[in-house]
Amino acid sequence: FALRTRPSAREEMSAQKKVTIDGNQAAAYVAHKTNEVIAIYPITPASPMGELADEWSAEGRKNIWGGIPEIIELQSEAGAAGSVHGAVQAGALTTTFTASQGLLLMIPNMYKIAGELSPVVIHVAARSLAAQALSIFGDHGDVMAARSTGFAMLASCSVQEVMDMALISQAAALRGRLPFVHFFDGFRTSHEMSKVELIPDEIIEAMIDNEWLVAHRGRALTPDEPVIRGTSQNPDVYFQARETVNPYYSAMPGIVQGIMDQFAGLTGRAYRLFDYFGAVDAERVILLMGSGAEAVEETVEHLLGTGEKVGMLRVRLYRPFSAVHLLQALPASTRHIAVLDRCKEPGADGEPLYKDVVTALAEDVASGEGKFKHLPRILGGRYGLSSKEFTPGMIRAVFGNLSAGQAKNKFTVGIHDDLTHTSLEWHADARNLAQEHVKQCLFYGLGSDGTVSANKNTIKIIGEETDNYAQGYFVYDSKKAGAVTVSHLRFSASPIRSTYLVNAGEADFIGCHQTVFLDRFELLDMAAPNAVFLLNTPASVEDVWDTLPR
């Protein structure tokens, strides 16, 4: 790499170009700009990240140091992780992309990479693990399976955050010498089209200190300057040696926050390890991470307008888990907390994030000198497994459960559990104020008929040629072609946080691209008052009414 002179603060604050892309492209963009070796193996929903990186290198696109990243496709995710491990030991800047079972195959190498304090970032489109059945859709089961590897873990909630956190994790890994899993929700974020601000090269360069690169190169294994690494240790030293990583993990939360602050100064987008939104005197707080936090923030904003004392806390840095920063972010008025996990750990007495929060607050109270004199009531819940919908009505049900005299702990929301009765009841027709200012559209098509591609182009045109914000999410099953696709599009003058589908009675525009759907689906049930319905049909204007189902 060629060292470059750091640009001035004024140059760094240059206007950022707005583009309309999905989460996978946002992560791949930063990864390609900040790495030299990219090991890939395809797995849904992370495959587009590797495909884009491969395409860009084939086109000769360069990273910020003027080199073209080398793309290596391996025989499996285990091979990709092994290649990353080898490349980083040789002093290269390296990354990979994966999800689900692919991440599980990387775990053996991840322990070594973390134990050797190697600055790698793995970008994960978080996806369900195969249990009673396989699912290609999103939850946090895979990243939670890797939480004990020693990798730091940074979560993104939106497409814009994917781009931003990809850069922040890359900088933090080099600065703090810990590898990162940067994860975001599979499909809900990885495949959502959204209008974002593109981070220009000068800001990426400003975030990556040349001294960190020189130090990383200096740790490369080379026969010219031999050192020993990766030995076999006996009981006399292994325990002591294992504890030597402690200072790096203790320092990492502060390092990440410092890099977030630097990023805010360059872009105007500010982040915290734990970001609170809500009433300053909130009594009920929901705590979670991932795309669901967007819908919770939208709902909290609505409830604040009705006088509710509620709030929400989104977790960004999950590992190392900083109890200090968590407690700083929580209002002192908090009395009831719902911790929502997007995973299930069978046999455990609670899901991972829930247990971390309970431990942090219990230790604070037990110290006698902490923020809370009495332990708030903390309830754990599961939501959104395999991309199950997480709507405003469900979020209100969680807040309602916090108010209940006989509150349900270790609950589920979003399903009807008639076996073990863990589920909360919710109102399916609940709406937020934010939805009233958004134009919502639905398009029904068949896989490979061009509907999804056309809608992506529509979103790009409106997002990039007007001042409006645009969001597109596309619902289809695991079949490659021929299945029904439903495109959910939203357009608004303000940022869109609705990380859930367009519901019945909400669509301002409905496009039916196959006449057979009229016999199969109640399409007009989705229409809002005064909605426009567009039918793609071979029938003439005179004959079309006779073709409609009676």
Where are these regions (language model features)?
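Conserved thiamine diphosphate
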Residues: 136-186, 210, 359, 366-384
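Conformationally flexible catalytic loops at phosphate/diphosphate-handling active centers
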Residues: 65-69, 180-275
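Peripheral docking tails and interdomain loops at the edges
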Residues: 336-432, 550
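Thiamine diphosphate
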Residues: 10-145, 150, 167, 392-393, ...
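Short acidic, glycine/serine/threonine-rich loops at helix termini
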Residues: 49-54, 83-86, 106-110, 131-137, ...
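Active-site cofactor/cluster-binding pocket
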Residues: 17-20, 320-321, 336, 340-351, ...
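Short helix-loop-beta junction
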Residues: 55-60, 298-312, 363, 461-468
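Redox- and metal-dependent alpha/beta enzyme cores, enriched for Fe-S-associated oxidoreductases
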Residues: 280-308, 321-328
